Amino acid sequence: LGERNFPAGSIRLCASERSWGRVLAVNGTELTVEQATPRLLREVDIAFIAAGSDVSREMAPLAVEQGCVVVDKSSAFRMDPDVPLVVPEVNAGDISSHGGIIANPNCSTIQMVVALNPLHQVSPIKRIVVSTYQAVSGTGAAAIEELRQQTAQMMDGREADITPQTY
């Protein structure tokens, strides 16, 4: 936001309980991380949520109820037909159809559609097949712990307890 000179009268940082009270520098100003409460959200125009799907599913509707527009980085709303999935360089106009929440695709999708959009404008692309390999850390602490346990099991010569799932 600082690099783009985004017009912000004030910035509030909110996070999970483990980060409350932490002090972070934003645009040369030290800000204390706070708990996201309905009262705080009433004072906010735009809430950027980048804390995982569970947090987004809980906090985004609460923020919208308090009058915020939510830009969500998680996968929570990406497949919701009522929530625009926006890459500003490609479909910024879709922002106007939001009902309070604007979803953001995952990082590999963003760079792919930014690169493909000019080609699509000249010759419409009908289908793309893509495989990506994502870091487990992007899924959160529970997934990192699961990978640690599976690695330990395999290093001990045991079969790893693996439950396939989509993150």
Q: PLM features: residue spans?
A:
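N-terminal Rossmann-like NAD(P) cofactor-binding subdomain of oxidoreductases
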Residues: 1-167
